[in-house]
Amino acid sequence: MYLRSDVKIDLSEEKVLSSSDVFEVLFDNKKTQNASRLFAKWLDSKGGRASKAEVSKFADQLQTGEIMINEVPFKYSRRNFYITVLRKLVGMGFLQRNVPVWDEKSKKTSYVYLSNTFDIPKKPPSVGFWRISYFICRKWNQTFTR
């Protein structure tokens, strides 16, 4: 999977370090940030993996406003979820798509979305792109409790 060239992300060290989570770095729009946070929380509750059907059901729930933020229904278009949130997370390597997993219940292989947890050192590199990448990956890892 590749990342489209028209994707705009502010990768300044100041923005990355001052952001509260990885979604503030990846997405400019507040509504998109909220949708991605909800998705990450939902995915974490499922052990970091979900089938295409489960992700589709989650996208439907976003569209119909069944998911709440602070007791208020949150609506986000299914199309925007797939095109903006899911595509960027897969394209940047935060999620893997079509990962084969053996399903003990049905006794067959199923293909799922799987969150990546990055193996990063305890200390960040000193300068440059790798330093910024380190902090982005650390923020992503902190999103998932497993």
List the predicted regions and their residue ranges.
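Short, Lys/Arg-rich nucleic-acid/phosphate-binding segment
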Residues: 99-109
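Short amphipathic alpha-helical interaction segments
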Residues: 72-92, 97
